[in-house]
């Protein structure tokens, strides 16, 4: 697919894709994913062509930006590593997020409380989000999916080939997708300047790690307060001793 020069993959983005292990695919290859294989390593792991990954990210972003109402786009992730990324993507682009379990009938049963009629669905994994893809096929909703080389591609209209099992890989794909959508909408005018949002914001974080970090920050703050109190007491003691010395000298 030939793209205008402004959509070319930059060296910085290529380094991000490689650093996040987006290029590491599975050992098995589904027949429709064969065009995305760059090569096979000696250990049997198939390497994804990140150039084709970028082309599909741009294509998906152009589809998303073409929908007038951002809320008509539904971003789904039942996979734990993709839930934070989906929520951040929705916050930045205005899409509707479904993070966690997808309620069966959300697209087909209008009686359910969670019923939606989207114009586009984006899923993190065709296997874990199979119910959403199946219901989308019933009501003719186009589907964009992050697919590994062994992922099923039935009812998937646009497949973004990548490593959809790693937390950094998933977060980075959603980050790049959100950035390209905002650029196409005109929210980010200058393509030569980096986005102020960092990719780390889209990465999954273990709740225990977050709690531990908060506890460490609280402990550090408490230690600083204690040090300040001790310093103040020492200063007061020094001032008092100096005053007494002057009184004794005056006698």
From Swiss-Prot:
Pfam short name (any one): Ribosomal_S2
Chief subcellular location: cytoplasm
Keywords for this protein: Acetylation, Cytoplasm, Ribonucleoprotein, Ribosomal protein
Gene3D superfamilies named in the record: Glucose-6-phosphate isomerase like protein, domain 1
Entries under CDD domains matching the protein: RPS2
GO MF, one annotated term: structural constituent of ribosome
GO annotations of cellular component type: cytosolic small ribosomal subunit
Family the UniProt entry places it in: Belongs to the universal ribosomal protein uS2 family.
This protein's name: Small ribosomal subunit protein uS2
Organism: Lachancea thermotolerans (strain ATCC 56472 / CBS 6340 / NRRL Y-8284)
Originating gene: RPS0
């Amino acid at each position: 697919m030939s793209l205008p020069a402004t959509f070319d993959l930059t060296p910085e983005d290529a380094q991000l894709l490689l650093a996040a292990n987006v290029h590491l695919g599975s050992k098995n290859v589904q027949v429709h994913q064969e065009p995305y294989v760059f090569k096979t390593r000696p250990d049997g792991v198939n390497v994804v062509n990140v150039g084709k990954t970028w082309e599909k990210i741009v294509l998906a972003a152009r589809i998303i930006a073409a929908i007038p109402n951002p809320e008509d786009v539904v971003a789904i992730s039942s996979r734990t590593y993709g839930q934070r990324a989906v929520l951040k993507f929705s916050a930045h682009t205005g899409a509707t997020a479904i993070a966690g379990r997808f309620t069966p009938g959300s697209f087909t049963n209008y009686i359910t409380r969670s019923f939606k009629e989207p114009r586009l669905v984006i899923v993190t994994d065709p296997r874990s989000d199979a119910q959403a893809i199946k219901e989308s096929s019933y009501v003719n909703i186009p589907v964009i999916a992050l697919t590994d080389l062994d992922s099923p591609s039935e009812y998937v209209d646009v497949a973004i080939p990548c490593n959809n099992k790693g937390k950094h890989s998933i977060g980075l794909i959603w980050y790049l997708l959100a950035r390209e959508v905002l650029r196409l909408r005109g929210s980010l005018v200058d393509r030569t300047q980096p986005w102020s949002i960092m990719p780390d914001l889209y990465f999954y974080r273990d709740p225990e790690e977050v709690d531990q970090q908060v506890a460490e920050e609280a402990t550090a703050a408490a230690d600083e307060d204690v040090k300040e109190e001790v310093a103040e007491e020492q200063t007061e003691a020094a001032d008092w001793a100096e005053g007494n010395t002057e009184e004794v000298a005056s006698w």
